[in-house]
Structure formats: C-alpha cells, structure tokens
From Swiss-Prot:
Primary gene name: lgt
Family designation: Belongs to the Lgt family.
GO MF entry, a single one: phosphatidylglycerol-prolipoprotein diacylglyceryl transferase activity
One annotated Gene Ontology cellular component of this protein: plasma membrane
Protein name: Phosphatidylglycerol--prolipoprotein diacylglyceryl transferase
Keywords: Cell inner membrane, Cell membrane, Membrane, Transferase, Transmembrane, Transmembrane helix
Entry-linked Pfam families: LGT (PF01790)
Role, per record: Catalyzes the transfer of the diacylglyceryl group from phosphatidylglycerol to the sulfhydryl group of the N-terminal cysteine of a prolipoprotein, the first step in the formation of mature lipoproteins.
Cellular compartment(s): Cell inner membrane
Recorded topology in the membrane: Multi-pass membrane protein
Transmembrane segments: 17-37, 59-79, 95-115, 123-143, 181-201, 206-226, 242-262
GO biological process, one term: lipoprotein biosynthetic process
The keyword Lyase is assigned to this record: no
EC number: 2.5.1.145
Amino acid sequence: MTFALAYPHIDPIALQIGPIAIRWYALAYIAGLMLGWRYVKFLVARPPNAMTELEVDDFLVWATMGVVLGGRLGYVLFYKPLYYLENPLEIPMVWQGGMSFHGGALGVIVGIIAFSRFRGRNLFQVGDVICCAVPIGLFFGRIANFVNGELFGRVAPDVDWAMVFPGGGPLPRHPSQLYEAGLEGAVLFLVLFGLWRLTGIRHRAGALSGVFLAGYGLARIASEFFRQPDAHLGFLWGGATMGQLLSIPQVLVGLALLAWALRRGAKAA
C-alpha cells in the first residue's frame, strides 16, 4: 500500500446539552423520516393519489414505530440472538447501535398493511409511495454509519480511496458505508423517481414496490462484497454474508411482485 485517505474522525455526538447527548445516528433517522415524509406528501398529491396529505402525517407515526421496533428486533434475531438471550435488558438500548434494515423493512411492511386496512386504502398504492421515499432514509443512515466509523469495508491495500477506520485495525479498508449510501440511497432513489414519472408504471399498483425490493436487494448483495462481515458471524453458506442471504429472498419477492403488477395492469381509479 502506498496511499490511504485519512478518515475524518467525526465526533459521533453532534450536540451535547448537559447530560443529554444528541448523536448523528439519531439525527440521521430524524432527517430520513422528515425528508421522506415531505417527499411522500409530494407524491400523493399526484395521481393515483394513494392517500391524502393528512393521512401521510398519520402514517409517519406508523412508519417510525415500524422502523425502530422492526429494525431493533431484526438485529436482535438475525445478528445476535444468543447475546441478547443472555442480555435481554439491552434489547431496548437502541442508542448503543444495532439496527437491521431487513427487520426495519418488515416493520414498515406490517405498518403499511395495518394502515391500509385501517384507512381503507389500496395496500400496493400505499406501499409504492412509501418505497419511493425509503432510499432517503437509507442514504442518511449509511452516512451516519460512516460518521460512527462502523460497518466498514474489507481490507483494500491497493485502493487509493481506502481508509484506516478506528476499530478496523491498521490496514486501509473500503469505505463501504459510502458505497451503500450511493447504491441503496442515491441510485435507488433516482431509479424509483424516474419510474414514478412514467404514468404507465406508477398506475400499476405494486410495480414500484417490486422495483424497490429487488433493487435494494441487488444493491445490498453487491455492496456486501466490499463490506467486512460481522465479526461474530463471519462468512456463512458458500462464503455469503448474512446481509446477502437476507437479500436473496427479498430480490425474488420483488421480482415476483413486479411481474404480478405488470401483468395485472393499471388498476381502475
């Protein structure tokens, strides 16, 4: 290795007010939810009008609960079940870190189903507009991972933009958090927005949800090739990581949903 970028070493605490510490991680979740909320309001103001703007305000509560509860429980069950079985009192301690996208996604899906039934809305139309906004939260979440110096990449001695992360040893590594912010966040957001602008796509309820599920799964599978596996899990079947194994069924479900939506055609208003 001849060169490595300097890791910026940003304090994970954005603001300290007496005993109260506000972390970048928390601000990332807040920014993702708030900007996603505004973006969904923009989307529902246009056909097929999945819900009203007031209902978007209501759904924000459902989404927040789904993300936090699902994300935390997903991490507990998928990544450290034995640890939390021995330390159950630490399960609610989300400020210590440890959230799972796949768990958060399941939590939001449950929220979408419950909200749609309660409000009498089309499940797939609601899902489509929510899925269009999710990459915003993913982008900020991955940036927060980078600020915290966590979920760093694999050793990359021959990559000029590699960084030496605190807690990652002396060797430079891929800044895989930024790769994920780009793929799962920015690129997926632009793809979904571009497809949403096509009337023939956004009126086919479920199509955008399918694109999101498959698109995120593919982006996650690709980025995992550069990301260091969780130390307590390592590589699993066939050299795959837990993130890849959880993403494979997501891709299949997304492709099936997309195919179903395209065959079903535009639903009458």
